[in-house]
Amino acid sequence: MHNESPIIRRKSTRIYVGDVPIGDGAPIAVQSMTNTRTTDVAATVAQIKALENVGADIVRVSVPTMDAAEAFKLIKQQVSIPLVADIHFDYRIALKVAEYGVDCLRINPGNIGNEERIRSVVDCARDKNIPIRIGVNGGSLEKDLQMKYGEPTPEALVESAMRHVDILDRLNFDQFKVSVKASDVFLAVDSYRLLAKKIDQPLHLGITEAGGARAGAVKSAVGLGMLLAEGIGDTLRISLAANPVEEIKVGFDILKSLRIRSRGINFIACPSCSRQEFDVISTVNALEERLEDIITPMDVSIIGCVVNGPGEAEVSHLGLAGSNKKSAFYEDGKRQKERFDNEDLVNQLEAKIRAKAARMDESNRIDIKVQN
């Protein structure tokens, strides 16, 4: 029930990764990347489907060898979500996966080779209507840029990106997006800010190699939050040393926090104190686990006492304000006559949330696909 985001997004051009629009005001797409052996087709397909189930719009798959390219062909046949092939070193792998229906090619300027090889990839992408991501990374800059700047700097990352933007411009290819990732928050943020002033293409955001599930989520939230709040970013990937499913959850949580794009329930819950009339923490944990399948955007406040409980409930779709033995229940900001037994809050509130979701959105789906 909170207002729309006040953020004014940067204007950018539009490309499509499969049927998912990127840029020009399209919903910010949330991506992840498989961490299975690509040659293990069954495991990779299973992970892609798990990512799709938690809301991934696009999935990137590493294709390091020709054997992996042949496996990619089989993987693509078994999934419906758009796939990006992550290509390093050997441009011929990009040409091969293009034959197998890849939806986007990610190439790294630091290791893909000379302009002639890039031309071969671009010509193939143009013929098959495949977009490209120029993916610059602070850990793999070209050697001459390492020598010139001494260390990764925003200017170095952006110069690397612009070299390849210029190549694509000369080849009259405009179906691309760009990323300038770094593991340092300020380096990444300053690089994206600088790049955003130079080009109109969509920007893919990420803090690369951010760390484990907790630290990586915090680092990504800080860095990407700064950029998104400034309107920079058209698609994102949270890089965690964790189950890729967590990357999607964190990505949506960041977008949800900024009211840019909502998926599922936004739980507003107090950290609890001695005033709580029920166990807030266990209640929230249980509901989060039970209701992962609900993707209809909804604010649900769960507050353990009457200090802030009524106020939060009045601006939520559903709300609970703790009281002795039975807690007050709110819907659409209005207190209901019905009260919930504090010993059975999880079951009662789950039923109310599911019923509310069904009324708000019968299909319980969010469609990122928008019209031109």
UniProtKB/Swiss-Prot annotation:
Coiled-coil intervals: none
Residues binding [4Fe-4S] cluster: C270, C273, C305, E312
This enzyme's EC code(s): 1.17.7.3
Cofactor binding description: Binds 1 [4Fe-4S] cluster.
Gene: ispG
Provenance organism: Vibrio vulnificus (strain YJ016)
Listed GO MF terms: 4 iron, 4 sulfur cluster binding; 4-hydroxy-3-methylbut-2-en-1-yl diphosphate synthase activity (ferredoxin); 4-hydroxy-3-methylbut-2-enyl-diphosphate synthase activity (flavodoxin); iron ion binding
Family: Belongs to the IspG family.
Keywords (A to Z) from UniProt: 4Fe-4S, Iron, Iron-sulfur, Isoprene biosynthesis, Metal-binding, Oxidoreductase
Record field: transmembrane: none
GO biological-process terms attached to the record: isopentenyl diphosphate biosynthetic process, methylerythritol 4-phosphate pathway; terpenoid biosynthetic process
Cofactor(s) needed: [4Fe-4S] cluster
Highest taxon of source: Bacteria
Primary enzyme class: oxidoreductase
Reaction(s) catalysed by this chain's protein: (2E)-4-hydroxy-3-methylbut-2-enyl diphosphate + oxidized [flavodoxin] + H2O + 2 H(+) = 2-C-methyl-D-erythritol 2,4-cyclic diphosphate + reduced [flavodoxin]
PANTHER family on file: 4-HYDROXY-3-METHYLBUT-2-EN-1-YL DIPHOSPHATE SYNTHASE, 4-HYDROXY-3-METHYLBUT-2-EN-1-YL DIPHOSPHATE SYNTHASE (FERREDOXIN), CHLOROPLASTIC
Listed name of the protein: 4-hydroxy-3-methylbut-2-en-1-yl diphosphate synthase (flavodoxin)
Pathway in which the depicted protein is active: Isoprenoid biosynthesis; isopentenyl diphosphate biosynthesis via DXP pathway; isopentenyl diphosphate from 1-deoxy-D-xylulose 5-phosphate: step 5/6
One of the Pfam families matching this protein, by short name: GcpE
InterPro entries linked: Dihydropteroate_synth-like_sf, IspG_bac, IspG_bac-typ, NO2/SO3_Rdtase_4Fe4S_sf
Function (record text): Converts 2C-methyl-D-erythritol 2,4-cyclodiphosphate (ME-2,4cPP) into 1-hydroxy-2-methyl-2-(E)-butenyl 4-diphosphate.
